């Protein structure tokens, strides 16, 4: 059956702010406590979705999570009415209020790991929400993520939505940001590629400055629960030196699609062995791996981190050609811009480069790839997604007007203490569930 890769982007939430919560994420730390523009952030992401949908790519949207999370704040000991909880947290522990208010669920590459039905033992699409246990503000996401995915992908004949792995350092799981898939065609069996930063029970190199968030054990557990064939599953370790340089997920240093791996020469430990293993595995699936390795002499790791060259989307057109979707920061870095010009002019599979303004997300360390969750669906599976989440002219207009109606154009750290922000967010999300036809998705609606 024909299949297509759909990208489900996270809609930026009304509490988008710069709290500097993500140690190891250079952009997040550099922009700590600056004022954010939630309205601009949401519109920038929505415009990317619309342009890609207009180009013929399957484009869906995932709703924001409810923030601030009163559930977290109450769990942490703040009591009283909702406004009292926020006021107490703001006075006694503003860092916890910031964690409870983060809009980080917008980066849906961390929402889950997804295996298409062509790869799984039971012929269903499998989702495992990421536990994101390395960061408090993200560790609170997985239950709502599971609820959202279970709502959109509800038919058990086609979909299996698992619980997140147990939230312990040994099973630290950051989702699809450390996972990609190679195949001859989307609907045919492929190779699933899991990248980890460290192993809990194996000796090996580890970063010294910043934490490795993904473990080998978590990647292997996801592969096992999805029923992936052992010979079609490849594991690789990310080079700890690039983690220490700010590459906190593999999608900051590599991106793959179909038969192509676009990567930096310093991305992996024992890279040639990894290339050889991927090549042999993909050859058995009827395709030849094409590695586009960017040399450090052309684009340094620092260039990659500041421009987010590899935090790009690599998309296949109907004619088989590929397009690279990059943030505008790539055009503002001379080395990266020169490399992209050379890449597009060459004879390789990447023929076009699309540039987007995602400045608000980028200042928190999230580029095009962070904002999307890839889900390969065949025709029957796509038909089973009955919510109004596919971007078209009508939905775009509704969401654009919804953002104009409900979002602030400035949100500074001190604004998180405003109890009106909670009311504004809940009003907005209540209306959004009607637009997307997802029912009573949020705790406050139940």
Curated annotation (Swiss-Prot):
Pathway: Amino-acid degradation; L-arginine degradation via AST pathway; L-glutamate and succinate from L-arginine: step 2/5. Its EC number is 3.5.3.23. The keyword Hydrolase applies. Substrate binds at residues 19-28, 110, 137-138, 213, 251, 364. It catalyses: N(2)-succinyl-L-arginine + 2 H2O + 2 H(+) = N(2)-succinyl-L-ornithine + 2 NH4(+) + CO2. The active site is at residues 174, 249, 370. Pfam families: AstB (PF04996). It comes from the Bacteria. Keywords: Arginine metabolism, Hydrolase. InterPro entries: AstB_sf, SuccinylArg_d-Hdrlase_AstB. GO terms for molecular function: N-succinylarginine dihydrolase activity. Gene3D superfamilies: Succinylarginine dihydrolase. Transmembrane segments: none annotated. GO terms for biological process: arginine catabolic process to glutamate; arginine catabolic process to succinate. Disulfide bonds: none annotated. Catalyzes the hydrolysis of N(2)-succinylarginine into N(2)-succinylornithine, ammonia and CO(2). Belongs to the succinylarginine dihydrolase family. Homodimer. HAMAP family: AstB. This is N-succinylarginine dihydrolase. It comes from Burkholderia cenocepacia (strain ATCC BAA-245 / DSM 16553 / LMG 16656 / NCTC 13227 / J2315 / CF5610) (Burkholderia cepacia (strain J2315)). The gene is astB.
């Amino acid at each position: 059956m024909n299949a297509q890769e759909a990208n489900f982007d996270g809609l930026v939430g009304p509490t988008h702010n710069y709290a500097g919560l993500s140690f190891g994420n250079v952009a997040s730390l550099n922009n700590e406590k600056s004022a954010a523009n939630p309205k601009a952030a949401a519109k920038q992401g929505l415009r990317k979705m619309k342009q890609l949908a207009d180009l013929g790519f399957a484009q869906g949207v995932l709703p924001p999570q409810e923030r601030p999370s009163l559930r977290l704040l109450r769990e942490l000991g703040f009591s009283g009415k909702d406004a009292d909880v926020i006021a107490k947290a703001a006075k006694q522990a503003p860092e916890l209020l910031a964690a409870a208010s983060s809009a980080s669920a917008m980066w849906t590459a961390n929402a889950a790991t997804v295996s298409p039905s062509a790869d799984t033992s039971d012929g269903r699409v499998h989702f495992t929400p990421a536990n994101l246990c390395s960061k408090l503000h993200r560790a609170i996401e997985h239950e709502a993520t599971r609820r959202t995915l279970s709502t959109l992908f509800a038919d058990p004949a086609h979909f299996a939505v698992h619980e997140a792995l147990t939230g312990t350092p040994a099973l630290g799981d950051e989702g699809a940001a450390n996972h990609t898939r190679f195949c001859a065609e989307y609907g045919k069996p492929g190779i699933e590629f899991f990248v980890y930063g460290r192993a809990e029970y194996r000796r090996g190199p580890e970063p010294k400055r910043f934490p490795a968030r993904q473990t080998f054990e978590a990647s292997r557990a996801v592969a096992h629960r999805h029923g992936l064939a052992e010979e079609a599953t490849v594991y690789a370790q990310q080079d700890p030196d690039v983690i220490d340089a700010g590459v906190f997920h593999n999608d900051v240093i590599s991106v793959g699609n179909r038969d192509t791996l676009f990567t930096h020469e310093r991305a992996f430990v024992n890279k040639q062995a990894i290339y050889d293993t991927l090549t042999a595995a993909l050859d058995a699936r009827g395709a030849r791996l094409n590695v586009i390795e960017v040399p450090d002499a052309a684009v340094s790791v620092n260039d990659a981190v500041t421009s987010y060259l590899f935090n790009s989307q690599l998309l296949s057109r109907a004619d088989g050609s590929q397009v690279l979707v990059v943030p505008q920061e790539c055009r503002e870095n001379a080395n990266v811009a020169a490399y992209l010009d050379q890449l597009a002019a060459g004879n390789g599979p990447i023929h076009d480069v699309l540039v987007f303004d995602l400045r608000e997300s980028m200042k928190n360390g999230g580029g095009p790839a962070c904002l999307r969750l890839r889900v390969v669906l065949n025709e029957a599976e796509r038909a089973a997604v009955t919510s109004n989440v596919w971007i078209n002219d009508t939905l775009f207009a509704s969401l654009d007007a919804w953002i104009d109606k409900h979002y602030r154009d400035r949100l500074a750290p001190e604004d998180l203490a405003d109890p009106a922000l909670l009311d504004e967010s809940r009003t907005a999300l209540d209306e959004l569930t009607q637009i997307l036809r997802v029912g009573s998705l949020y705790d406050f609606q139940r």
